[in-house]
Every structure is written in structure tokens, then in C-alpha cells.
Amino acid sequence: MTTLVVVATRAEAAPVPAGLDVVVTGLGKTAAAVATTRAILERDRKGLVVVNIGSAGALREGVEGLHEVGTVLNHDISAEAIRALGYDPQEELRVGDAEVVLASGDLFVTDPAVRDELARRAHLVDMEGYAVAYACRQLDVPVRLVKHVSDNADESALDWPALVDLSARELGRWLADHAPG
């Protein structure tokens, strides 16, 4: 089995253990989907597993630390409107057995009203997880999403550049202990 580690930023990639293949996607769903797809197509897919690591905002009180995601949502798509047109928006993907739900979108969540709305459906929020999972699903490559809480998806998210290093170190330790191949 070969692991491809997918991260949004160089800061999140810095603590990845030597010897693991790493792709830095850039921020947001479009950048993540394109970079993940390109990276998968450039590699032998037999035995490949993608591990998307990164920081995330906590949407609920008491959610902290490191989490493996079981379900990921595309939170800023008009799913009901798309469904009404007769199409499946595939806004929710099951990626593992964990109960943690991650909401991904191109919004940097700092607004308490947005946070509260997302908290009804998810535990964590990020900007890339859904896109990575969707690309993997389309290319029949297994994926794991592992996130570390860096902020509370409120005004503290504006301090993200200062907080991401702690998350990156924790994720690097997790990879050293759990990443296959």
C-alpha cells in the first residue's frame, strides 16, 4: 500500500514524515479537487490510499484535538435546488466508520450565524476535505480524512496562520504512527 498525503498548505506539509509522498493543493475546493485528481493520475493507483490531513474549525463546543472523519459534506452547494432539477448533487460522502462529520466549503467561517447553521449538520469545518474525497471517489481511490482543530470557526479563525503550526505538528505525529506505506 502506498500513501499519498494531500494537504492545503506548505505549513501543514512541513511536519509530514520523510518518505511519504506529499501534494500541496492550495486553499479551497477547486484547487484541492484539481491537485488531487492530477496527483492520482500521475501515480500508479494500485494500492494507493490518499490521506488528507489539515486543520479544521470546531463547530460545536468541546470539539478539540485530532479527528478521523466518517462523513464529509459540501456545505456551500445548493443541493435542494440541484435535486429539484433532477440531478444528484452528491453533497454528502461517507468516507469512513467514524461518527465525525466534516463540512467543507469555500467560506472561511468566522460568522457565528454560519457556524451555528453548520453545527446542526457537522462537527468540523474546512475548505478542502470534500473536494479531496470527491476526486478520490471518482477515481476509485480509497481516502481518509484526518483533521486537527485549530480554531472555533469564529473570530478566532482569523488567527489561523498562528495556529496552524500546532495542528500540523499533531497531524505529522498521527501520520508517523498511522500512515500505511
Which residues does each predicted region cover?
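Extreme N-terminal starter segment of soluble prokaryotic enzymes
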Residues: M1-L4, L48
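Glycine-rich phosphate- or other oxyanion-binding loops that anchor nucleotides, phosphorylated ligands
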Residues: T9-G181
